[in-house]
């Protein structure tokens, strides 16, 4: 089974993906590292630009029939059996990205993406089985336990549980207006 863990930068993808893979006994794959290793994409202005179609094809070929947790904000473009879209309060994302040294424009772009569900919408356009999980105020262990419970119960689709419209005013200073 291929489980893709995706979300806006700063939601906890890597932490959750590694823990989920460990709990399930699955292989963990960081998509950025995988793309670099396979020569998929190129560096442009200090960012790796990845050809999503090439990534999807190579990943599908290399991991077909394997149990894998794929970690990356492009993982929802893979042919996955299940896509987990991690969400977090946009203000929390802003704080985390600021700590990581993100510039104002990139920070604003990602806060806005979380605020208006960009990753979730993309995931739903690409996949049938999408589960949305709000990580706000939860430990990584709690998030993984929630995911495992949903998987055990056979839940393949759970979306629409997050609405950040009430925090819009709080994140306004971070947005690129």
Swiss-Prot record:
The EC number(s) this enzyme carries: 2.7.4.3
Substrates-to-products reaction catalysed: AMP + ATP = 2 ADP; ATP + H2O = ADP + phosphate + H(+)
SUPFAM superfamilies associated with the record: P-loop containing nucleoside triphosphate hydrolases (SSF52540)
Transcription among keywords: no
GO BP term, example: rRNA processing
Alphabetic keyword roster: ATP-binding, Kinase, Nucleotide-binding, Ribosome biogenesis, rRNA processing, Transferase
Pfam families per UniProt: AAA_18
InterPro entries: Adenyl_kinase_AK6, P-loop_NTPase
Family to which the UniProt record says this protein belongs: Belongs to the adenylate kinase family. AK6 subfamily.
Name this polypeptide is given: Putative adenylate kinase
Organism (species): Thermococcus kodakarensis (strain ATCC BAA-918 / JCM 12380 / KOD1) (Pyrococcus kodakaraensis (strain KOD1))
